[in-house]
A protein has these predicted regions:
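Mixed-charge interfacial surface used for oligomerization/domain docking
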Residues: 2-5, 14-28, 33, 39, ...
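A short glycine/small-residue-enriched secondary-structure motif
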Residues: 47-52, 81, 103-108
Length: 284
């Protein structure tokens, strides 16, 4: 535990930080909820992405915010572990009410200094904000400086992703500025990111899956440019083999990353994007 200056980092489960990095950086996780007609599950705790995809044919579940009691219990656990200052990395307020829900509960907690950062992002692009905060804490910086540097780092983090179909984003009401009429007849595939308001927006359009993958690779190289000090992630939603193809194409950048993460997106994000997602997270 990093108790030298009693600062903890908390991230919601849609920050998509792999378990090994959570353990290494001592980051606490707050799960969102997945709700089927017959039962509810804590994201990444009680249910896996594979289980969500397997059940899509019979039921597409709803998702919801972390339960208030879960938020309160999590802060109580952090306090019991000896921390009195907390930096929270929350997925975009433009896509979820999670950030606001945590802030409301945090306001009622006494004897703890809690700063909730709206990452205006999603998935590992939010997770990189949490990992950056943990890095500053490890370096021994005081709380106020960790907060200011982490808030500044929000603008340095980017998500880029393509989906198998826009159907799930449309059903979940998370389509943002991505046009739902991008024709399946034309096989147009948008590359999606979060804009400055933290809402999904189209940053490129290509034709077909193969071109979509190539565009993600090209945009990754373009965004990283000559940067030497960067975080990189390659993620997927039920598209493991294609993720490996992307990783092979980007192996030089993978090898040079200060932090590299890969894996399947969280069950909650899988509900909203459907099978076939391929994504890239970058922080420079």
């Amino acid at each position: 535990m990093m108790k030298s200056n009693s600062i903890a980092v908390l991230a919601d489960s849609c920050n998509d930080i792999p378990q090994e990095l959570l353990d290494k950086c001592h980051i606490y996780i707050l799960p969102l909820m997945i709700n089927y007609k017959d039962a509810s599950y804590r994201d990444r705790v009680d249910i896996t992405p594979e289980q969500v995809y397997e059940r899509f044919q019979e039921e597409i579940p709803k998702t919801s915010l972390p339960l208030p009691e879960t938020i309160a219990d999590t802060f109580a656990k952090i306090k019991a572990d000896g921390f009195n200052q907390v930096i929270v990395s929350a997925i975009s307020s433009g896509l979820s009410g999670t950030c606001q829900a945590i802030r409301l509960l945090a306001d009622d907690i006494e004897d703890m200094q809690i700063v909730v950062i709206d990452t205006l992002n999603i998935a590992i692009a939010s997770g990189f904000v949490a990992l950056y905060a943990a890095e500053q804490i490890e370096a021994g910086l005081p709380f106020e400086e960790v907060v200011s540097k982490t808030q500044a780092a929000v603008k340095q983090s980017t998500i880029l992703f393509g989906v198998g179909t826009l159907e799930y984003l449309m059903k979940g009401g998370r389509i943002g500025k991505v046009s739902g009429i991008l024709g399946s007849a034309l096989n147009i595939k948008p590359i999606i990111s979060c804009n400055e308001d933290g809402i999904y927006d189209t940053v490129a359009k290509v034709r077909g899956r193969k071109q979509s993958i190539q565009k993600l690779i090209d945009m990754t190289r373009e965004k990283l440019g000559q940067h030497k000090n960067y975080y990189l992630s390659i993620c997927h939603g039920d598209a493991y083999e294609e993720m490996l193809v992307m990783k092979d194409q980007l192996k030089d950048l993978v090898a040079g990353a200060k932090i590299y993460a890969e894996g399947q997106i969280s069950p909650v994000l899988g509900v909203h994007t459907g099978p076939g997602l391929l994504g890239i997270g970058i922080m420079v």
